Amino acid sequence: MAKALNGVRILDFTHVQSGPTCTQLLAWFGADVIKVERPGTGDITRGQLQDVPNADSLYFTMLNHNKRSITLDAKNPKGKEVLTALIKSCDVMVENFAPGVLDRMGFSWENIQKINPKLIVASIKGFGPGPFEDCKVYENVAQCTGGSASTTGFRDGLPLVTGAQIGDSGTGLHLALGIVTALFHRTHSGKGQRVTVAMQDSVLNLCRVKMRDQQRLAHGPLKEYSQFGEGIPFGDATPRAGNDSGGGQPGRILKCKGWETDPNAYIYFITQAAVWEKICDVIGEPTWKTDPNYAKPGARLPRLNEIFGRIEQWTMTKTKFEVMNICNPFDIPCGPILSMKEIAEDKSLYATGTLVEVDHPTRGKYISVGNPIKLSDSPADVRRSPLLGEHTDEILRDVLKFSESQVSDIRSSGALGEVPLAAE
């Protein structure tokens, strides 16, 4: 079955996480992604957090499925010729270099347009134009500057970064959408364009409800926040709210049976107004359905600590899965805190392709996250990540149509890596 992006060729000049997240998603959808890597070392993540000796790390393999790898020294004159040929033959170039790197390599936007006016150049930067645009950004820096850290954690504690990679992977996902949009636009315009996503912007986009709350503060306290019920005044910025729900429906993480020894024996429980009476019945407080102190959402807001304390008394008598089984038939929204071990052992996730087992020639089998986006007519298969330079000759011959003598000249120039010494 043909894939959605069959026929789209992508020159992948990305490394670490943000860019590879983008290009891997496009590869899953069928694009031919050619990953350009530095001879000898390749993407730095090949050797980072290595768990199996002499094998690519999971950090690399889980972000570079379905790609081809070519090693290339772009500073070498022959290497620059190869790169120019790749630019001519590709539809998209994706890069997440520091600002100015492509220009210094001789591939400014103006020069790229001369080489291939239909090429889409997609870039990830830390910040957009402004006082910080030349600063280097990593995952946690993006979270801190994009509004996530200042609004995550508890009111009386430090700002916190989230375990989800919203800065790196979140930006990569935004860029993938931008690339597909630019490809569609090209069908009308016939021209390439630049697509740029800043990590700060991506994090802020995912924190839009906190910007919503920032503006609501001008009109009074945020009544769904715990501190309102505790009588604590609000400041002039959106506060950290612990595990309060961000959608206007009060919610908390509550202890379940076994919490004393199991760090994940918890459940997230939402006191949605539509099912309040069912909640009262489930926890054994039927009088709360008519008591004016509890019956209406507005009356409950100053009493959320008391209410969730009572619900927790009930959840502590059940496992998190028992709570789910009891609440789901009543449409009471709740969800267990699942550990990565529990998720990795969930067979239903393998059935849907959300988790996949991948075999690798040097590290053996490992579990990876598959494509979270399911297309009915373009199912994604997950193939292993490439070894360093595995497809170099294939790309030179089959994609760029270089002759054997041309490939030999390129190799002997050192553009593909260290030149083997002649036998004595």
UniProtKB/Swiss-Prot annotation:
Pfam families recorded: CoA_transf_3
Binding, substrate: G247, G248, Q249
Catalysed reaction equations from the record: formyl-CoA + oxalate = oxalyl-CoA + formate
Active site (UniProt): D168
MF annotations from Gene Ontology: formyl-CoA transferase activity
Listed pathway(s): Metabolic intermediate degradation; oxalate degradation; CO(2) and formate from oxalate: step 1/2
UniProt-annotated binding residues for CoA: Q17, S18, R38, N96, F97, A98, R104, K136, V137, Y138, E139
Keywords annotated in UniProt: Transferase
InterPro entries: CoA-transferase_III_domain, CoA-Trfase_fam_III, CoA-Trfase_III_dom3_sf, CoA-Trfase_III_dom_1_sf, Formyl_CoA_transfer
Entry's EC annotation: 2.8.3.16
Protein family: Belongs to the CoA-transferase III family. Frc subfamily.
Alphabetical list of HAMAP family matching this protein: Formyl_CoA_transfer (MF_00742)
Name the record gives this protein: Formyl-CoA:oxalate CoA-transferase
Native source species: Afipia carboxidovorans (strain ATCC 49405 / DSM 1227 / KCTC 32145 / OM5)
